[in-house]
Amino acid sequence: MQLADKTALVTGGSDGIGLSIARELKAAGTSVIVVGRNAGRLASAQAEGFEALEADLSAEAGCTALLQALGTRTIDIVINNAGMGSDFDVNAPVDLAATDRCIFLNLNAPIRLIVGLLDALKARPTAMIVNVTSGLAIAPNAGSPVYCATKAGLRSFTLALRAQLKGTSIHVLEALPPVVETRMTADNNHRKLPAAECARQVVAAMAAGRDEANVGMTRLL
């Protein structure tokens, strides 16, 4: 896909993988709207030249507010990157409210945004949906069962979505990062891929029109 002169929406775009993807796209000539929920990080993104929208996508109200804020804006690329982890051990007290937020942000929000923006994307000569899943969608970790389940669910949704949109102007890409150096993985002692390198590989896959971006070590899965 030609990335220059396109407009991309990047959720979770004020930090980590999302911000790094936004920077790569900007360098390729794409106008980028970053979405996040931290006002300070959004202000920093604005200082880099990005348009910023504040929305908490871990609840239905935040998804609705974002779609309303976008209105009839022209969007060529939607990158569903926002995500969160969830501590979950059935042998210990479980915070079900936090579990629900994780499921909504990681799985429900991408589906809602895709449904809300689908007609606008179909109207574009070329468009793209990028769903950021994880290597854990293929090889789950017993310590993060809810997170792994949401990413596996998004992977399955992405595969079906690609089949349903065959023959339209919309290309569907799944990005599967390994453990990446972000705030979310600060306590993870595994070897981490720099967010900038992850973003470089994802954007290269977008430009090449690939169906999957198996980033870093996920190529081995």
Task: Please provide the spans of the model-predicted regions.
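Residue(s) in the substrate-gating loop at a strand-loop-helix junction
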Residues: 134
